[in-house]
Each structure stands twice: as structure tokens, then as C-alpha cells.
Swiss-Prot record:
Protein name, as recorded: Alanine--tRNA ligase
Record-listed E.C. numbers: 6.1.1.7
InterPro entries the UniProt entry points to: aa-tRNA-synth_II, aa-tRNA-synth_II/BPL/LPL, Ala-tRNA-lgiase_IIc, Ala-tRNA-ligase_IIc_anticod-bd, Ala-tRNA-synth_IIc_core, Ala-tRNA-synth_IIc_N, Ala-tRNA_ligase, Ala_tRNA_ligase_euk/bac
Top enzyme class: ligase
PANTHER family referenced in this protein's UniProt entry, alphabetically: ALANINE--TRNA LIGASE, CYTOPLASMIC, ALANYL-TRNA SYNTHETASE
SUPFAM superfamilies given in the database record: Class II aaRS and biotin synthetases, Putative anticodon-binding domain of alanyl-tRNA synthetase (AlaRS), ThrRS/AlaRS common domain, Translation proteins
Domain note: Consists of three domains; the N-terminal catalytic domain, the editing domain and the C-terminal C-Ala domain. The editing domain removes incorrectly charged amino acids, while the C-Ala domain, along with tRNA(Ala), serves as a bridge to cooperatively bring together the editing and aminoacylation centers thus stimulating deacylation of misacylated tRNAs.
UniProt gene name: alaS
GO cellular component, one term: cytosol
HAMAP family in the cross-refs: Ala_tRNA_synth_B (MF_00036_B)
GO annotation terms (biological process): alanyl-tRNA aminoacylation
Length: 876
């Protein structure tokens, strides 16, 4: 058996299948493209899902890939096992070969056997296989054609050897190949539960059926093949180690964990588990952030946040108290950079995001520790020796407090907590998250799928021209149905063979315009691409009737498109300027490009200063003034990245990509752009704000929209200059001076109101003499709670030992504000907070506070007398 490094195995696998006529497809992003039903790519076949479903055509029938895969949820939830077993991972690489209606079982089995035994030189006697119990064909191929003895072929049921994409759709039997690790792992029966001897290394899925809504299986006209072999597993076999964590993929990261912790791997099982968790999670963190996932409180970002916090928790178990994961990112990149060169480009960004999240969690953990001890103290006061599930879940969910650390602290304090209630709340939260995620899923109308399979791909000519003189109407959609004709006033969708209309994608909105024929005029209100390769024009028939098969003139709204192009190229310049001013950690996190304005979301950890915004705006405008040519080139994806072109995180790119070079910007982009930077005209930032933690948003305008905004601000300044009788360069000083004058006048007015209120109090104050103290109450007009407090303090000093209520009607809001002040000597028996609650509740109000001072309010001015009566009752 040949020893091979992981890089050598990856290269060998792809080279072998390339020699067998397979197109090598680079790994897709971990973030699934156009599939909101999945949080992450969790299998090697996911990027080919639409091909298997017949929704997408590729220029090849055979493919092979090494796909980045991430599993933490659904049926593929490996998180809790990570670090505790030799094989479970969150992130791993899946080697796979695929056939889309080309070869089938015989060839798939032949390829797998030949590659394993001849190219990897695994001894044949070490290999066993399983087949679906009813799949006689696969059994015969293994037995008769390959020559595998019957004793090494195990028939298994639906659970183990029948694969399906979902409740309905493509499915079929599978055949799994196992490696016998030898008698030192026991002598269990092949296929038994908890079998550590026989290691599954390759799964061959034979997609030959379509399951309908009733569960009935129908043979597919073009059966397909989907196979998957985990790189980490096959590496453990070829490198002769018992655990994936002992392969060259993980050893450098575990060595890093040893160095940063001062512990030695292999000496203590608890420490070993922690190091394995850190090694796995560091790989996941690096690839997730590189592919565009950012820490957040929901969705993919929440998963990343959990992974980072889980790794930190295990680091704490090793005695690591400071941020350290960001340093380990370098180790992961060094190991994986050959296969994934984009990691090098994203290194600084990945480290910045990781370190920031580590620092936040360490601060949060300190705060949540304080809250936990407060909960323990409160429980002791209530004679409880346990915390509720609700209390502990809040710490876990809101603050990310590790549950095992919580258990340890509670145990040390002699406490327990309601674990059942905690898990119930956890499941409820997971279910809410699942429903929230699924609700984002957009169903593709069956009519679009029908057209996708029926029609040739639309030809888009909108890069070169805004008008197509001789397009043909291929289809008309009304509602969810295909129709032959549509008449005046009807809302429909039209599909053309050739179109200049750009469909909404990549943040750029869809084009508008008209489609006209000899007998009709159709207004295009939006252009969309519901499935790849199908462009639909949505709008209304203005007059006449349109028929399928008609030849038409399609004309895009020229002014609108030009404004969109200005904003799109301006967005590229803005992105480059932000990186120039703020640093390379800036990455696009979302965008909207319209004819009216642009919106650009980007990664940054604090609000931008006025100086930074000014520098960005000035840099963009300098690039516009240079009036350089905007160059569009088509090149191979890898070549584009090497040339320095920026790739946007969540975009999917073909092997051949468009690279847009505009001044300081060079990006991969499929959108429409101006010919020269000077065509943008002028650029102006409107606002900068927060979207979420670590993500900022800039809204801006370009071209005539920017000129309009500039003119609007110019005339506002002129009007202000006239109104304030100051020159434009003196406006700021004039406004500051006016503000100070207004504040001074407000202070004078406030003092006069207080004096007036105090003079009225002497006439209206009601005093009840009690034994050893006084009870007083009074009503004053239109004072706020702070002013009421000052009056109450004044009366308390004047009257000596006393309990005082001061109330004020707010006529405008139809509300009564009131305060109660109690001398400290009386606050043990007459607590201000209790008095406020009692009198407020009697008048349907609310309030509370300290024993010596409290405040409240009621939303009905007619109940003021009732408030006073309740107050007097307390002392009667």
C-alpha cells in the first residue's frame, strides 16, 4: 500500500478521473448557491443538485471534484462527536466522481476498484463492500465482474444502502466500500453496529429512480452516479494511522495547540479531546470565513459563532485564557493553500474576524460569569439550591455561556439546574431557527422548470447593445400557466430567444423597457432569472395582443440602464477605496445597484469617522476624474485570482469569468458597467450605518443623482446663510453660537418655572401632621419628572422628617407624572417604591424605585384626586 500525503491523494484522485474523461470541477463555496433550504454544502453532490434534478445543464456528462463540506445540523450533525471519535468532523473534503446520464453501475464500480487497488495500491484482500439488499445487479458486478468473493459482499437494507435526495425526487441504491483495519480492532461481524474494524471509505450511489408523492419509485430515463470518499478517511488508511487526527491534515494544527497550551498530545485523554476539537474547529473557522460567513446571532453566522466559542471553551480547558485561534489560522492556511489558494488572499481578513470574535466572547464570558453568580446569590436568598432551565438557557443562548462550564461552577457552589427544561428550551429554539430558515426558501414555479427543460438557453446581448431588433417570443406565462396569446391590460411574463434586458442578479436590479411587435406593445417592468439559463420579462400588455412565435423588437430603457451602470462601476470603485482607506479586512458583504442609488455592505468593526468618509469619497471622485477606460476581460477563474481580481464571497463563478478593471478596482463581475470611469460623472456618499456586528453599510449616489443631491445641499446652505445672516464659511460658528444661546435661555426658563412652581406650592401644599413626622402632597402644572424630584427634595429639606408626594399634569400627553420622597429615618417603615406601586396601581398606573425615592405615572389626568386619596389612606 502506497504512503501518500493528503495533497498527493487529492491530486491523484482528480488526475485519475480526468484520464477517464471526467471534467474536473473546482470546489464550490461552502455556502450553497441559490438553495435556501440548506445552511451549508453538506455533501459532494450539492453543487450538482440542479443537474441531477434536470434544472441545469452542464457542458459535460462526467465530473470529478474535491468539495469543501461542512456538517453541523440536520441529519448530518457531527458537532457533539467532534474530538471524541477518530472520524467525526465539522469541516472535511469529499472526493467524488459523478455521471449525469452517462455511465452507470458497472463503470462506477470499475473506476472505484481500479483506483483503490491499482493507483492507491490498497491490497484487494483488505476491501469489502455492501450493496442494497434488492440490488442483484450491483451484487453480480462485484461478484462476477470484479471477482470479489460472496463472503465479502454484504446485503443491507434501506437504512444503510438506499439514498434519497428528499421525501420525493431522485433516489437509488448504494454500494459502500470498506477497508479492513485488522484483528487488533476486534473481530465483529462485517456491518455490525459500533464496528471499529471495518472502515467505510467510499460510497457509490446509483440514482436510478424518481420517488413520487405517494412513495412509488419510477425508473429514471437517464440514471446517474454520485460517489463520495472522505479525504481525511482515505488519508488515515494510506498513512497507516488509526485516527484522522493523526494524518498530515491535522498534525500541524495539533502541534500548534500543544505550543499555545504547553500541553503534550497523547498524554491525557481530556487534553487530547480538547486539542482535536481545536484542530477541527480551526479548519472550519478558516474556511467558513474565507467563503463569506461572518459571526452573527442567526443562520450561518450563528453556527460560526458557536464553533469559535466551542473552540475557545476547549482552549480554556487547556488553560488558554487569551485569544489564540486567530494565530492558528496561519497554520491551517499553510497546510491547505495549495488546494485552496484563495485562503492566502483572505488571510488577513480571516484572522481579523476571528480575533475580534474571540475578544468579544472573552468579554461576554466575564460578564455572564457575573450574571451566573448573581443568579446563584438570588437563589440562595429564596432558599433554592437549583437554577431553573430558563435561567441557565438564557445564559447559554444570550451570552454563549458554555453549558459544561456552567455545570462545573454550579456543582462547586452546591447547586443543580433543570436539565430537562434546558433541553426543551434548546429544542424549541432550534425548531424556531429551522422554521425561520425554511421560510426563506423560495419555491420555483413548475412552469419555469417546464420551460427550462423545453427551451434553449436565452442569449443575452445586453453587454453589447440595448436593443434587439429581431427577437422571437418563445413563451408567454400568465399566472402559473403557459398561454399562446395575451391581450391588452394583462400582466404576463415573456421569454425571448435573444434579449438585451439584464436580469436581476449579483446585486444589480433587472432592466425595464419595452417589447414591441406589429400588433402589440408590452412594457417590461422587471427582468428576472428564476432558474439558470431562463430570463423572463415581467410586465403589462399596453395595447394589442402578443402571440407565441411572434418576432419583436426588444428595447431596454437607455437612461435607466445608464444610471444603473454608473452606480455599478461606482460600487466597484467604492469597494476599492474602502480597502485603501480602512484596510484589506474590508470585504463586500452584500450590495444593491439600482438606477436611483447604490447600497454597499462591507465588513468593518466600527463606524467610519467623518475623515474616513471624506477620504473614500474623494478617492472615488479622483478615479472618476481620471476618466480611465473600464476594461472587461474573460479569463479562467484561477488566472483571474492570480491577476489580483477580487472575488465576492457568496457569488458562484464559472470556470471562465468576466474581470472588470476600473481604475484602482479589479473585480470578478457579471454585471453591466460604463465604458470609462468618467462616465460616472460624480459620486456622493449619503450615509454610513451599522447592519449588524462587524458589518457596515454605505448608501451613495452617482451621476445625475449625485449632482441633484449636491445641488440640493448647495441651496439648503444658501438658504441657511440668508436666514442666519452669515457667510457660508461662518455658518458652523453661527449655529454653535445660536445653540449656546438657546441652551442659556432654556436654563433661564427652567429656573423661572421652578420659582413659579415653588411659589404656588406654598399656597397649594397639603400637610397632614402625624406623630413625629409630616405627610404632604401637592399638584403642580407641566413639570417633568426631574423637576418634580427637585421640588420633592426641596420640600423634604423644608419639612424635615416627612413623606411627600408631588404630582404634575401633562396636559398635552394626558398623563400625570408623580414622585414620592421619604426621609431616610422613615424609609424602613414607609418605602417610597412600595408607596408609588400602591397608589399607581389604584389609578391603573405604574411605577417604582428606591426606599427613599420613587416615581410613577398614570395615563388619565382625571384620576389625580384618586391618586391623592390612595396616598392619604396609607397614613390613616
Amino acid at each position: 500500500m502506497k504512503y501518500m500525503t493528503a495533497d498527493e491523494i487529492r491530486q491523484s484522485f482528480l488526475k485519475y478521473f480526468e484520464s477517464k474523461g471526467h471534467t474536473i470541477v473546482k470546489s464550490a463555496s461552502i455556502i450553497p448557491e441559490n438553495d435556501p433550504t440548506l445552511l451549508f454544502v453538506n455533501a459532494g453532490m450539492v453543487p450538482f443538485k440542479n443537474v441531477f434534478l434536470g434544472l441545469e445543464e452542464r457542458p459535460y456528462k462526467r465530473a470529478a471534484s474535491c468539495q469543501k463540506v461542512f456538517r453541523v445540523s440536520g441529519k448530518h450533525n457531527d458537532l457533539e462527536n467532534v474530538g471524541y471519535t477518530p472520524r467525526h468532523h465539522t469541516f472535511f473534503e469529499m472526493l467524488g466522481n459523478f455521471s449525469f446520464g452517462d455511465y452507470f453501475k458497472k463503470e462506477a464500480i470499475e473506476f472505484a476498484w481500479e483506483y483503490l487497488t491499482e493507483h492507491l495500491e490498497i491490497p484487494k484482500e483488505k476491501l469489502l463492500v455492501s450493496v442494497f439488499e434488492e440490488d442483484d445487479e450491483a451484487f453480480e458486478i462485484w461478484n462476477k465482474h470484479i471477482g470479489l468473493d460472496e463472503s465479502k459482499i454484504k446485503r443491507m437494507g434501506y437504512k444503510d444502502n438506499f439514498w434519497s435526495m428528499g421525501d420525493t425526487g431522485p433516489c437509488g441504491p448504494s454500494s459502500e466500500i470498506y477497508y479492513d483495519r485488522g484483528e487488533k480492532f476486534g473481530n465483529p461481524e462485517f456491518g455490525a453496529e459500533d464496528d471499529f474494524r471495518y472502515l467505510e471509505i467510499w460510497n457509490l450511489v446509483f440514482m436510478q429512480y424518481n420517488r413520487d408523492e405517494k412513495g412509488v419509485l419510477h425508473p429514471l430515463p437517464n440514471p446517474s452516479i454520485d460517489t463520495g470518499m472522505g479525504l481525511e478517511r482515505i488519508a488515515s488508511v494510506l498513512q497507516g494511522v488509526d485516527s484522522n487526527y493523526d494524518t498530515d491534515l491535522f498534525k500541524p494544527i495539533i502541534q500548534f495547540a500543544e505550543e499555545v497550551s504547553g500541553k503534550e498530545y497523547g498524554k491525557n485523554e481530556k487534553d487530547d479531546i480538547a486539542m482535536r476539537v481545536i484542530a477541527d474547529h480551526l479548519r472550519a473557522i478558516t474556511f467558513l470565513i474565507s467563503d463569506g460567513v461572518l459571526p452573527a446571532n442567526e443562520g450561518r453566522g450563528y453556527v460560526l459563532r458557536r464553533i469559535i466559542r466551542r473552540a475557545l471553551r476547549y482552549g480554556k480547558n487547556l488553560g488558554i485564557e487569551k485569544p489564540f485561534l486567530y494565530e492558528g489560522v496561519d497554520v491551517v492556511i499553510e497546510k491547505m493553500k495549495t488546494a485552496y489558494p484563495e485562503l492566502i488572499q483572505n488571510r488577513s481578513f480571516i484572522k481579523t474576524i476571528t480575533k475580534s470574535e474571540e475578544e468579544k466572547f472573552i468579554k461576554t464570558l466575564k460578564r455572564s460569569m457575573d450574571i451566573l453568580y448573581q443568579m446563584i446569590e438570588q437563589a440562595r436568598k429564596e432558599n433554592r439550591r437549583h437554577l431553573t432551565g430558563e435561567e441557565t438557557f438564557k445564559l447559554y443562548d444570550t451570552y454563549g455561556f458554555p453549558i459544561d462550564l456552567m455545570e462545573e461552577i454550579l456543582k462547586d457552589e452546591g447547586f443543580t439546574f433543570d436539565l430537562i427544561e434546558f433541553h426543551n428550551l434548546l429544542e424549541e429554539q432550534k425548531e424556531r431557527a429551522r422554521k425561520s430558515w425554511k421560510s426563506q426558501s423560495k419555491e420555483i414555479k413548475p412552469v419555469y422548470l417546464t420551460l427550462k427543460n423545453k427551451l434553449p438557453e436565452n442569449q443575452f446581448v445586453g453587454y453589447e447593445t440595448l436593443t434587439s431588433e429581431n427577437s422571437k417570443v418563445l413563451a408567454i406565462i400568465k399566472g402559473d400557466q403557459l398561454v399562446d396569446t395575451a391581450k391588452e391590460g394583462e400582466d404576463i411574463e415573456i421569454v425571448l430567444d435573444i434579449t438585451p434586458f439584464y436580469p436581476e442578479k449579483g446585486g444589480q436590479i433587472g432592466d425595464r423597457g419595452i417589447i414591441e411587435g406589429d400588433e402589440f406593445l408590452f412594457e417590461v417592468l422587471d427582468t428576472q432569472t428564476p432558474v439558470d439559463g431562463l430570463i423572463v420579462h415581467k410586465g403589462k400588455v399596453l395595447f394589442g395582443s402578443v402571440k407565441e412565435g411572434a418576432y419583436v423588437r426588444a428595447k431596454t430603457d437607455k437612461e435607466r440602464r445608464e444610471n444603473i451602470m454608473r452606480h455599478h462601476t461606482a460600487t466597484h470603485l467604492l469597494h476599492a477605496a474602502l480597502r485603501n482607506v480602512l484596510g484589506d479586512h474590508v470585504k463586500q458583504a452584500g450590495s444593491l445597484v439600482s438606477d436611483e442609488y447604490l447600497r454597499f455592505d462591507f465588513t468593518h468593526f466600527e463606524s467610519m469617522t467623518d475623515e474616513e468618509l471624506k477620504a473614500v469619497e474623494e478617492l472615488v471622485n479622483r478615479e472618476i476624474m481620471k476618466n480611465e477606460e473600464v476594461v472587461c476581460q474573460e479569463m479562467q477563474y484561477e488566472e483571474a485570482l492570480k491577476s489580483g481580481a477580487m472575488a465576492i464571497f457568496e457569488e458562484k463563478y464559472a470556470d471562465v469569468v468576466r474581470v472588470i478593471s476600473a481604475g484602482i478596482s479589479k473585480e470578478l463581475c457579471g454585471g453591466t458597467h460604463v465604458k470609462r470611469t468618467g462616465d460616472i460623472g460624480y459620486f456622493k456618499i449619503l450615509s454610513e450605518s451599522a447592519v449588524s456586528s462587524g458589518t457596515r453599510r454605505i448608501e451613495a449616489v452617482a451621476g445625475i443623482k449625485a449632482v441633484e443631491k449636491g445641488l440640493q445641499e448647495h441651496y439648503i446652505i444658501k438658504d441657511l446663510s440668508r436666514l442666519l445672516t452669515a457667510k457660508e464659511d461662518q455658518l458652523l460658528d453661527r449655529v454653535l453660537k445660536l445653540q449656546n444661546q438657546i441652551k442659556e435661555k432654556e436654563r433661564e426658563i427652567e429656573n423661572l418655572r421652578k420659582k413659579l412652581a415653588l411659589s404656588n406650592i406654598n399656597e397649594n401644599l397639603n400637610i397632614i401632621e402625624k406623630e413625629g413626622f409630616k405627610v404632604a402632597y401637592v399638584s403642580v402644572e407641566n413639570l417633568n419628572p426631574n423637576e418634580l424630584r427637585e421640588i420633592a427634595d426641596h420640600l423634604r429639606q423644608k419639612l424635615g422628617k416627612s413623606v411627600i408626594l408631588v404630582a404634575s399634569k401633562d396636559a398635552e400627553k394626558q398623563k400625570v407624572n408623580f414622585v414620592v420622597a421619604v426621609s431616610k429615618e422613615l424609609s424602613e417603615n414607609y418605602k417610597a417604591g412600595d408607596i408609588v406601586k400602591k397608589v399607581a396601581s389604584a389609578a391603573n398606573g405604574s411605577g417604582g424605585g428606591r426606599p427613599d425615592f420613587a416615581q410613577g405615572g398614570i395615563n388619565d389626568t382625571s384620576k389625580l384626586s384618586q391618586l391623592f386619596e390612595e396616598f392619604k389612606k396609607i397614613f390613616s
